[in-house]
Amino acid sequence: MENSGKKYQIDTEENKMFLGELQKNLLNFGKGFLSPGGSAYFLGDDGTPWKDRNRETWITCRMVHVYSMGIMLGDKESPALVHGAVHGLLEELKDCENGGWYPGITPDNKFLPDKQCY
């Protein structure tokens, strides 16, 4: 097999470098997700936050998961992103009166109806 195909062979140096680049690119892509209150914006194809869309709880949870993995991988910006998103789950998205979490928040900061997260 020629050298260029080695990046697809598990555990070769080329494969490790290739996967490391993909990992770095994926983590860098999503770093704009965090809203000021901690909930997660949807992102466009270039990673730009879509501030005109709802910020949903499940996306915020996903980003906590992704950037928690980033912490384990040594990404220096991931701890602040996880902290901000967890803050959003504990404050902005949480229904402190009735328990559970709101499904999301509209761009004008109104809660989405039909709570599903308890």
Q: Predicted segments — roles?
A:
Residues 1-118:
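Glycan-recognition and catalytic cores of secretory/periplasmic carbohydrate-active enzymes
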